[in-house]
Amino acid sequence: MNYQDMIVKNKEWIDGVWEKLDKKLSRTSVKSRDKIPYSTKNGVHDSCTEGVLITNWTNGFWGGLMWLMYAGTKKDCYKLTAERSEELMDTCFTDYVDELHHDVGFMWHILSGANYRLTGNKRARNRNLLAAMTLMSRYNVDGNFIRSWNVTWEKIDNAGWTIIDCMMNIPQLYWASRELGDDRFKKIAVRYADMAMRDHVREDGSVNHIVVHDTEKADTVIETLGGQGYGVGSSWSRGVSWALYGFVLSYLHTKEERYLTTSKKVAKHFIESVEKTGYLPLLDFKAPETPVLYDSTAGAIAACGLIEIAKAVGGEEGEYYLSAALNILKAMEENWCNWEENEDSILQMGSERYARGHHKPIIYGDYFFTEAILKLKGVDFLPW
């Protein structure tokens, strides 16, 4: 069965979920217009707008979610809330420049970048370009990598750290390269993707969350760290999903087959892992059997990547990836989605990391779940 036939077969379910998303989010978009939520407390969105919290890496997802809904509905309630979110984040550039980090792609590409591509807003374009320049400035020329976090409060020497998550930030560099006609941005993105392919992705398709590099000698790995997973050598499911989606995005931006091949390799590991648990992703695929910890956000991110792989490869091979995406989304919608109108979050059972923050609603879960449904609806808008 080809891609379009599978979409037609599942159209009733896809349309039904989209209607529920629109019904709930159209209300929440107004209720939380002056917030930038991360999670909820007693069903009500919290907000990361005060002080340095405005630089939280997740702050682009609320406005980005609004742009997804605007792309699919053209309703002003979504556009107004997305624009308000951008305005609130302007203090990052005026008051907290030293706090900006590698996740500026998450913060602005799906927010300001989406705004510019959907509406042509020049101010939004400038915001996204500023963020792209910030990301490019983190490139270590000697070590040949983009540095991840800033100096932490523990004062750990992390100058050589890279993380797999950053595969989702480099699409901002591909965009800036095209927008400015400056290939420096793309070259750095490609170098990062090639590094991640070599140093983060393992033979079995699982990934190293953190890789420690020599800061003065190019392409030299010192060690790997467990990061947000169970430990060194484990398989943190959200890290796997960042790689799965991130590499197919690099393929879409460059048409380099090696990135699609890598994405498919990672996808095989993800699919085989979730098949064992009814398509509900565990927090870490290689952790001990107990405690049983899940992470819905990994499933939502992976579904987005699987849909893009399916469209890229087509045919019977594409059916394998699209079927997996649908199975994951349907399992999560049935078991983990909250459609109560008096509660603000949708996708439950997100987990921050193995050590803490388990089984809670997290804004990027709602974002990627909605993005996946938008893709299935056939809306021609890639926010990355």
Residue ranges and their predicted role:
Residues 1-384:
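Glycan-recognition and catalytic cores of secretory/periplasmic carbohydrate-active enzymes
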